[in-house]
């Protein structure tokens, strides 16, 4: 039986609710990590974004049907190639499924629209509280994908850290592919060397070729985004981590030592006195 030893400091704000109805009597939908407020603002924006993704999904379904109708109207036989539409539809369906997953998560997610932002997923140190910041709806889909990777253990955060660890070029490729399914034009020109004809063109190699305003490659080896160049997840070992940061491995080893095949989770907890959140 849970008990509180003080009155909720914001009890008057929710006078329409019973003083005994924790989280509005709906602790699955509402989470109160600090005992101060129910984050309804994010839920309203979350609902808007969910409907926007549904609308995009329905648009692609309609376009696919138009394509099929036109194919047969021209007297063609057999099955039309709908792979382009199928990839877009399946990706948007995955994005909607991810929204359900993070809504039910043990983590708390706050949405933060910031005009001009390129998008981030940040952790509030020493909590299970995460903020998705995005400058437009397409970037929300990108960061939503990273939140899903957190839920799946593909990336992780330390308890005291703000930024993701174990994030690699394959994680970024998945996020950009989801972003493309929502808004193809939002990723056009990011990699000036490769023209994107379909979602299948967004690969790890494409991510490495993305250029920033200075002509640099933020996702490449030694890039400003500090992205792993090989597949990583929270179960990766120290050696696998070094392999993903090959261009930096000497400096990393000199600074932190050589931990061989020790799992990164153990390295963080035992060496840096910090654990993973995933």
What are these regions (language model features)?
Residues 138-154:
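Active-site recognition of the HExxH zinc-binding catalytic motif
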Residues 1-3, 25-27, 150, 180-185:
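Glycine-rich, acidic and aromatic/proline-enriched surface loops and short helix-turn segments
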Residues 20, 25, 135-138, 142, ...:
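A structural signal for well-ordered alpha-helical segments within the folded catalytic domains
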Residues 1-50, 56-60:
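Short turn/helix-capping motifs enriched in Asx and small/polar residues
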Residues 162-278:
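Active-site or metal-binding loop neighborhoods of secreted/extracellular toxin and effector enzymes
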Residues 124-141, 165:
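Short pre-active-site segment immediately N-terminal to the catalytic Zn-binding motif
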Residues 153, 157-158, 162-165:
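Flexible, surface-exposed loop/gating regions in the mature catalytic domains
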Residues 54-125, 133-134:
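Auxiliary, metal-adjacent structural segments of Zn-dependent hydrolase domains
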């Amino acid at each position: 039986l849970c008990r509180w030893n003080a009155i909720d400091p914001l009890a008057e704000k929710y006078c329409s609710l019973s003083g005994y109805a924790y989280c509005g009597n709906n602790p699955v939908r509402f989470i109160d990590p600090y005992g101060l407020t129910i984050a309804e603002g994010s839920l309203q924006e979350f609902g808007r974004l969910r409907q926007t993704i549904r609308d995009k999904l329905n648009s692609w379904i309609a376009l696919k049907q138009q394509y099929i109708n036109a194919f047969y109207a021209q007297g063609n036989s057999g099955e039309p190639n709908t792979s382009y539409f199928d990839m877009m539809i399946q990706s948007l369906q995955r994005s909607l499924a991810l929204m359900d997953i993070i809504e039910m998560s043990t983590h708390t997610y706050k949405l933060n629209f910031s005009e001009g932002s390129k998008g981030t997923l940040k952790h509030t140190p020493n909590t299970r509280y995460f903020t998705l910041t995005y400058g437009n709806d397409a970037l929300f889909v990108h960061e939503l994908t990273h939140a899903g990777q957190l839920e799946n253990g593909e990336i992780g955060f330390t308890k005291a850290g703000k930024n993701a660890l174990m994030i690699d070029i394959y994680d970024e490729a998945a996020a950009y592919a989801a972003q493309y399914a929502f808004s193809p034009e939002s990723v056009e020109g990011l990699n000036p060397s490769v023209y994107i004809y379909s979602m299948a063109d967004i690969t790890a190699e494409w991510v490495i070729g993305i250029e920033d305003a200075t002509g640099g490659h933020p996702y490449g080896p030694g890039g400003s985004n500090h992205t792993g160049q090989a597949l990583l997840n929270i179960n990766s070992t120290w050696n696998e981590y070094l392999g993903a940061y090959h261009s930096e491995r000497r400096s990393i080893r000199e600074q932190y030592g050589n931990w061989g095949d020790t799992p990164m989770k153990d390295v963080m907890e035992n060496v840096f006195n910090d654990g993973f959140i995933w």
